[in-house]
Amino acid sequence: MKEINRRSFVKNTAISSGALLTVPFSLDAMANSSNNKKLKLAVVGCGGRGTGAVIQALRSDKDVELVAMADAFKDNLEKSLKSILQELDGEIKVSVKEKNRFSGFNAYKMAIDLADVVILATPPGFRPEHFEYAINNDKHVFMEKPVATDSSGVRKVLKAAKLADKKQLN
């Protein structure tokens, strides 16, 4: 197994976190390359960061549609949806069906299964597992930094990132 040193860790983390800056451009490219098909978006982690990322993603292209939301706590999810609706009032139609609002610690799986693109804005201790699940299910992923909280989490993220490259996922 390749040894991870501080320099390679910082480099790989910077590259991974830089993906967040490209959300609008990448979503626009994905939406336009899919033959006018709506790009289905899910958010996992409905705090302030997740809510803001969803608003930014929805504003990036008219063919991006929020189809699912997941959070460990239902009240966070409902507060997030309310904020999204208020922020985009009349600008963009947002309609996440009740059956596509998932809460609990395994909620991320149900939301990810419904999407083409996933925003991971959960606490960093959960991101390696969520990222791995999304990549194994052929989903494009944007995630908050830091990507993990410990070395085993970082290794899991790096392994999943290599698989994402092979699958040509963003």
Where are these regions (language model features)?
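ADP-ribose/adenylate-binding Rossmann-like module
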Residues: 137-150
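N-terminal glycine-/serine-/threonine-rich beta1-alpha1-beta2 phosphate-ribose binding loop
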Residues: 1-139, 156-168
